[in-house]
Amino acid sequence: MTAVRRATVVGAAGFIGRHLCRHLQRQGFEVHEAARDERGWIDGPLGHVFYCAGLTADFAQRPHDTVDAHVSLLDRVLRPQRFHSLVYLSSTRLYDGSLAEAAVEDAPLTLQPGQPRHLFDLSKALGEALCHAAGGGRARVARLSCVVKDASDD
């Protein structure tokens, strides 16, 4: 008998999360689509967590929601350690202020708290740091770039 592979997708209602849920289901995962207003899902076994929650276009108008999505909720997932693995979706926007010619993962980041646009970058960087510091060696970060919709998307 094969063990059930469980996945929890945080941010399942968003563009990436929605497509990831479909992909995981096709791969035979039992997928829990964690909703923003749902309570209690953090208290159970989460399996493989894909952390897709976040704000993009309206982050500047919603600073508290941005920090909550990128950091606070992530902390509530990481703290009890009820996951097998976790992938935190970050962004290559963290490289925007870099003076380097090419973006590489270990390049120093130039983030300026006084710049309103850097709220997004700082909150994503803090989410990454939290994964590295509190992920128990089971959290990974993926910095995505240029996620687009193609003709086959609904």
Locate predicted features.
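Active-site Tyr-X1-5-Lys
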Residues: G114-R140
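N-terminal Rossmann NAD(P)H-binding glycine-rich loop of SDR-like oxidoreductase domains
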Residues: V4-Q27
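Flexible, glycine-rich beta-alpha linker
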Residues: Y95, H118, R140-D154
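NAD(P)H-binding glycine-rich loop region in Rossmannoid oxidoreductase-like domains
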Residues: E38-P80, T92-G97
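Conserved Rossmann-fold NAD(P)-dependent oxidoreductase catalytic core, especially the SDR/UDP-sugar
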Residues: D75-L119
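Conserved glycine-rich Rossmann-like NAD(P)H-binding loop of the short-chain dehydrogenase/reductase
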Residues: F29-E38
